[in-house]
């Protein structure tokens, strides 16, 4: 019944704009070794989905957890977004170097979700939630929306205090796009990307550094 309620609520969006979509499954109980928080089922991702409508104006991001989401237990969910220039990769030390991003969505257990200063529409029921994200809030930095990459990681606690708070990643050490898992760039590709960014870096460095600092506080 809970699953049906969420599906029905999003039916107008899906019916009016056929989408490309992809889902990745994640094993139950695969808390990462570096996690030091309380291993509650609602911090264990079992599937993550990315859907983009036909007009490429709206993403629907969905997550299913191993247990009902309990607001009385400390924790929240972070979704990293790579819109093309996502060179932030802070999780190499905990075995997730390919989780790269340049935007962050935060979903609280009470159903509120934010992207920067913007509040997003969220449906939360039982052990799952869906967040609706306008593409206009995720401007491209080098690729098309259908090729944007996403990853979700739950955090224990109420604020970001370090990587030991992170319980799980979905997908593991990868990014999910609307067409499926995204390939990991070869080292030479990364080098060319970084050189290209360096050519325009002097023009946008202040804004970029400010964005990185802001992301570091919430991711």
Which ranges hold each PLM region?
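Extracellular structured ligand-interaction cores
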Residues: 56-58, 74-76, 117-121, 126-130, ...
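C-terminal membrane-anchoring or membrane-association module
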Residues: 201-219
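Short, threonine-centered small-residue motifs that mark membrane-proximal processing/anchoring sites
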Residues: 4-23, 177-199
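Ser/Thr/Pro-rich, low-complexity mucin-like regions
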Residues: 126-169
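Order/disorder boundary and secretion-linked terminal/linker segments
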Residues: 20-76, 80-112, 156-182
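A mature extracytoplasmic/lumenal domain signature
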Residues: 65, 135-137, 195
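Structured beta-strand segments within beta-sheet-rich domains
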Residues: 100-139
